[in-house]
Curated annotation (Swiss-Prot):
InterPro entries in alphabetical order: TORC, TORC_N
Function statement: Transcriptional coactivator for crh-1, the homolog of vertebrate transcription factor CREB1. Regulates the transcription of metabolic genes and may have a role in mitochondrial dynamics and metabolism. Involved in modulation of lifespan. Through crh-1, counteracts the pro-lifespan-extension signals of AMPK both cell autonomously and, when expressed in neurons, at a systemic level, possibly using the catecholamine analog, octopamine, as a messenger.
Annotated knockout phenotype: RNAi-mediated knock-down results in increased lifespan.
Organism: Caenorhabditis elegans
GO molecular function annotation: cAMP response element binding protein binding; transcription coactivator activity
Composition bias, Polar residues: 34-52, 224-245, 387-402, 461-475
Protein name: CREB-regulated transcription coactivator 1 homolog
Organism placement in taxonomy: Eukaryota, Metazoa, Ecdysozoa, Nematoda, Chromadorea
């Protein structure tokens, strides 16, 4: 009995589903027929056309009036099988001329007010859409219009070349963000005294190979083949590569430079050679009379200047041999501090006495291209170069006396716990009295911390425990145990 009832139930369900599907198909066909009549013949039914006024596609404007698929854009999808092919629309030859003479097309705006003004006929405006039709239904909004005239170039001539490629000679005409012009003038050095070039070209070939190979390449300041720019210490920078024309010094201070060892601005560009552990230093030459002769910013080799009594370089200036400045022959080795002190004393005599007529060499050490800021103490405190030397305008060492010995700062800003101000800590119980309530320190008994046993077990105040003479704000006693004291 059950076997005979099961197929009948399924057949009834199948019949019900088929009936519902037929009804839905009939309803869908009726709706599609109405939509097709509205979209294909908008003027036949007046009632439906008023309800769907924004749907018709404008036949004037950019779209050609007669297209095989143009009438289907606003309604249902076209029948693919009835279309011959998807050929691109053939624009009329004078479409730009028609757009040019169209009223209210010169501006590009998305505001509804401009669209209301642009409607030639006084028809009421419908809902605004930036990419939709005008209120009169004749053309698109100005945002969808092509250029106003055939010679219209929205971004200038460089962007309208064939293939949208810009020739190199017109790169500077592109209206885009430009970087600092000092970047492009970094390599521009003008030699002041060309008669010293022959003497300095000879020294470049005498330099070690690692110094010759360490010359900055195209990305650096100077190219190795332009020897007249490499070996002349009388080079004045161009442009604003050092911040200002008056501030003629390297803006990046060398590594280990502190205290009164200041950067020299203007005519006093002298620096102490004892500012770097390996003496890798930018060569700076200072003069009393503000001579415009300056060294290249990143010259990888050092030079020697002979100063006469007036403070200007004498015509018998030579380049010192590279061995005198080759402090880095042993990699990682510290410099000879005695030679450094002698050079520093000679340098001080030159600047304080005005320079000896026949002697007094200033040895500028080798300088790195990239150096960090003042981050640590010097190896040996040296005397100041000149009493009238001043640092950069933005340097924090403006108010320091150049002749005073370097004073180590009492307050440091490092993260090491030795230099931090540690507050006083006292172990107390809930009543405020020091006692044996700190159960969290019971684990320290296994470590053999005898200084905490009396606190944990006997409840003695911390004053009786701290019998070692230790300074305040410290956790460390001479016994090597960690203890808390008041």
């Amino acid at each position: 009995m059950s076997n005979s009832n099961t197929p009948r139930k399924f057949s009834e369900k199948i019949a019900i589903l088929e009936r519902k599907q037929n009804e839905e198909n009939t309803t869908f066909e009726d709706i599609m027929r109405q939509v097709q009549s509205i979209t294909h013949h908008p003027t036949d039914s007046s009632g439906s056309s008023t309800a769907t006024a924004p749907m018709p596609i404008p036949q004037q404007g950019l779209l050609p009036p007669q297209q095989p698929w143009g009438h289907n854009l606003g309604g249902s999808l076209p029948n693919v099988h009835q279309m011959p092919s998807y050929s691109p629309p053939q624009w009329p030859p004078n479409w730009q001329h028609e757009i040019q003479h169209r009223p209210i097309q010169g501006h590009r705006s998305r505001s509804p007010e401009d669209h209301m003004i642009g409607s030639a006929s006084g028809s009421p405006s419908h809902h605004y859409h930036p990419y939709g039709m005008r209120s009169n239904g004749l053309s698109r909004s100005p945002d969808r219009t092509p250029p106003q005239h055939p010679q219209y170039t929205p971004y200038g001539p460089p962007y309208n070349q064939p293939g949208q490629l810009v020739p190199p000679e017109s790169w500077n005409q592109i209206n885009r963000a430009r970087s600092d012009p000092a970047i492009h003038n970094m390599g521009g050095m003008v030699p002041m005294h060309p008669h010293h070039h022959q003497q300095q070209q000879m020294a470049f070939h005498q330099m070690p190979h690692y110094l010759q190979n360490s010359m900055p390449g195209p990305s650096g300041m100077m190219a190795p083949n332009s020897q007249s720019q490499q070996h002349s210490p009388q080079l004045t920078p161009q442009g604003s590569q050092q911040g200002s024309p008056v501030q003629m010094h390297h803006q990046i201070p060398p590594p280990l430079q502190m205290g009164n060892n200041q950067q020299m601005g203007g005519g006093n560009n002298g620096m102490s050679p004892l500012q770097s552990p390996n003496h890798m230093m930018t060569p700076m030459y200072g003069y009393h009379n503000g001579s415009p002769l300056h060294s290249p910013m990143d010259s990888p080799h050092a030079s020697t200047l002979m100063l006469d009594g007036s403070g200007t370089p004498s015509p018998y200036m030579e380049v010192s041999p590279p061995g005198m400045h080759d402090f880095n022959q042993d990699a990682g080795s510290l410099p000879n501090l005695q030679n450094v002190q002698q050079q520093q004393q000679q340098q001080q005599e030159i600047y304080t006495n005005g320079g000896a007529p026949g002697g007094g060499y200033y040895h500028a050490p080798i300088g790195p291209r990239h150096s960090t800021g003042a981050c640590g103490p010097r190896l040996v405190p040296g005397p100041a170069l000149t009493p009238e030397s001043q640092s950069a305008p933005t340097s924090p060492h403006n108010q320091l006396d150049p002749n005073q010995p370097p004073m180590w700062p009492t307050r440091t800003f490092s993260n090491s716990p030795e230099a931090l101000d540690i507050p006083k800590l006292t172990i107390t119980n809930a009543e405020g009295a020091p006692g044996h309530h700190v159960d969290s320190y019971n684990d320290f008994n296994d470590l053999g911390l005898d200084s905490l046993d009396s606190v944990l077990c006997n409840g003695a105040p911390p004053q009786t425990i701290s019998n070692h003479q230790t300074p305040n704000n410290s956790f460390h006693d001479p016994g090597g145990t960690q203890m808390l004291q008041n």
